[in-house]
Amino acid sequence: MRVENNNVSGQNHDPEQIDLIDLLVQLWRGKMTIIISVIVAIALAIGYLAVAKEKWTSTAIITQPDVGQIAGYNNAMNVIYGQAAPKVSDLQETLIGRFSSAFSALAETLDNQEEPEKLTIEPSVKNQQLPLTVSYVGQTAEGAQMKLAQYIQQVDDKVNQELEKDLKDNIALGRKNLQDSLRTQEVVAQEQKDLRIRQIQEALQYANQAQVTKPQVQQTEDVTQDTLFLLGSEALESMIKHEATRPLVFSPNYYQTRQNLLDIEKLKFDDLDIHAYRYVMKPTLPIRRDSPKKAITLILAVLLGGMVGAGIVLGRNALRNYNAK
């Protein structure tokens, strides 16, 4: 009787197939190597944590200034420009816009230093211009908070100085324009007075030629330039003397211009306490540092140490098996 030899798939072993149990046994036997590798990795991680620079982020939220914060500035603009002065809402938008631009410029400058500092400004809510979130990354929590407050104040002072300079320039220009306007109106008033005197003198000549000494009309309202001589030479001579000593006649606009000039000259820069922003949230004192993260660093050290240790064990055993062949 012939017995057939059937191949059982479970009894054949592929030499290239990984034996999981054998792998685990190898790792168990080399556990001391793995443990030492993990300990070394943890030691290196602790050393890194000891020397690595800590990063703490302080954050503040700002928005446009209140009306009260720019009351002096708004009043100055009203004095300078009168009816053409910008609205309070426009001033608020302009000020926070200048603050944002100056803050961004400072952040760029700090980032380009030999030892860069991270200062950022961005909208707090996506697709909305205000409020703005500003932040600073420092090596200590207190340092980050202090630096952020310092840089915010620094930018505010810079904007304040720029606004005062702009105001001085605008006041100087406004004063010059008003003075020029007054001089122009005074020249016009003087010319009108001189013209009136010449007209009366001309009428006096006609009256003398016509030998009209007494008024020939009953109502002076009906007298025109052509019939002015009918008032008579005596009246015309008296009118010339009166017009010569009479002060210049100005329109109401002249006195309003003088009042505007006086108001501008009374403006004082020391009284203008301008702020280009308002705090929604003052710089925070961070309670958690951004990096390095102790827990994550140690966990990664354990995993990396274990992987390196396992690699050493398996590599060493593979080398032994290869040499044995």
Curated annotation (Swiss-Prot):
GO terms for biological process: lipopolysaccharide biosynthetic process. Signal peptide: none annotated. Keywords: Cell inner membrane, Cell membrane, Lipopolysaccharide biosynthesis, Membrane, Transmembrane, Transmembrane helix. Residues 53-294 are periplasmic. Pathway: Bacterial outer membrane biogenesis; lipopolysaccharide biosynthesis. One of its GO terms (molecular function) is protein tyrosine kinase activity. Residues 1-31, 316-325 are cytoplasmic. One of its GO terms (cellular component) is plasma membrane. It comes from the Bacteria. The chain crosses the membrane at residues 32-52, 295-315. It is a multi-pass membrane protein. It is found in: Cell inner membrane. Belongs to the WzzB/Cld/Rol family. Confers a modal distribution of chain length on the O-antigen component of lipopolysaccharide (LPS). Gives rise to a reduced number of short chain molecules and increases in numbers of longer molecules. This is Chain length determinant protein. It comes from Shigella flexneri.
